[in-house]
Amino acid sequence: MKNHYALVVGGTGMLKNVCHWLIEQDYHVYVIGRNQSKLNKLKQETIQPENLHGVAVDYQNSTCLSNELSNLFETNGIPDIVVSWIHSSAPQALPLIKDMISKQDLSTDWRLIHIQGSARFLEKENTPVPKNCLYRRVYLGFILENNDSRWLTHNEISSGVIHAITTDSNETIVGTLEPWDMRPQ
C-alpha cells in the first residue's frame, strides 16, 4: 500500500504552514522549490522532518521539472493532492504537472488545489483537468480594516488553503474580493 503524499508547489514561502499541516495529517509532503536553503529550513521547522521531502528545481524550466516529476512519480505513484501556487512567469508548469500525472494513472482520483491571485477571479479561466482530477480553486483576496485594505498575511493564506482542503469546496475565496476598488495597490 502506498503512503499518502502531497505535492506542494510554492511551499517554502506563503504555503509553509500548509506543508506543516499536511504532515500533521500523516502525508508525506514533497515540496518543489528553487532555493535549497529554504527547503532545508522548511524541513528543519517541521515536527516530522522524515515526512518532508524537498525537490530542488526551478519550475520555470520545463525539462528539469519534468525530470524531477518523472523520478517522483516512478518512485511514489501519483500524489493524492497537489497544492499549487505557481507564478505567472511559468504558465507551462501546472499543465505539465497535470499532464504527467494523467500519463501515470487515470484510474486513481487526485485533488488539485489551484491557488490564484485576486485578479484571476475576474477572468474565470477554464482550467482543463484530467477526468480523475478533483479540481478546486482558491482565490487570494484582501482584508478590509478601518476603511483601508491590505493583502493577506502568510498565516491567513495558509489558513484559507487548509480550509479549502478540509471543506473540499469547488471554489474558495480567502479574504474578500469586494469592493474591488478597495484592493490594495
Model-derived regions: residue spans:
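Short, charged, surface-exposed secondary-structure boundary motifs
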Residues: 40-42, 123-125, 145-151
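C-terminal helical subdomain
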Residues: 143-184
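Rossmann-like short-chain dehydrogenase/reductase
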Residues: 38, 63, 69, 73, ...
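Hydrophobic anchor at the start of a short beta-strand
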Residues: 29, 52, 135
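Cofactor-binding loop segments of dinucleotide-utilizing enzymes, especially the Rossmann-like FAD-
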Residues: 11, 34, 117
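Canonical Rossmann dinucleotide-binding motif of NAD(H)/NADP(H)-dependent dehydrogenases/reductases
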Residues: 1-30
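Rossmann-fold cofactor-recognition segment
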Residues: 46-64, 84-87
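Conserved glycine-rich Rossmann-like NAD(P)H-binding loop of the short-chain dehydrogenase/reductase
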Residues: 26-41
